[in-house]
Amino acid sequence: MPQNITLVLTPRQAADAKYYTSLAARRLGMPEQDIALVRVVKRSIDARQRQPKVNLSLEVYADREPRPAPVHFDYPSVAGRTEVVIVGSGPAGLFAALRLIELGLRPVILERGRDVSARKVDIAQINRNGDVDPDSNYAFGEGGAGTFSDGKLFTRSKKRGDYNKALQTLVFHGATPEILYEAHPHIGTDKLPRIMQRIRQTILDAGGGFVFNSRVTDLEIKGGRVRGVWCGATLVEGAAVVLATGHSARDIYE
């Protein structure tokens, strides 16, 4: 069993694994050579004072390293299975698609904007010339609004659903493992486009579908239930519809 310890360090000390391992050994009264592994459980910054401090919560393992708990991501083929339409390819839409695949359903994602590579071109035009494509910009397109504007991970749902699995999924697709224990995890806009592409590829490899440049204009309602959506003159039907439209697509509800 590990021993748990919390250290208050300077930013430089918190970045030095050798230093905090040695300090943990002294605090626990054990020879440093008896420590098999020191694992960071949580790291947070206290900037209330003039000199910022880092609160480092550690698990200290003596004698032998623990076996890591296996994390399995089983995305079976859903080609030809019951289809569910997802409107929006931001975080909600992408994670909904992955969960549907786990449940044996085929997600079809409709995105009003363009894929993440094309979005880079459109955003460059905004910064260079002020030309804004209303459907492909900082707010719309593959990955959602945060892909090119920030990269911080924020949720109000830590008490609902498997928050850690969501982080593990991002690590599986290329995010750094530090997001698993940072108090304010941050992937970064330099890494997010590649991660979004990998998630899309996972969905496609499992038989899911993506349709870009497809703005939803209306809902198809039959018998009091939503049975699909209209993209202009094109009807896309499904057993259910997930509206994962984010905060900017207010027009779909008007």
Where do the language-model regions lie?
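Residues forming the flavin
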Residues: P2-V54, L58-F148, K152-T169, H173, ...
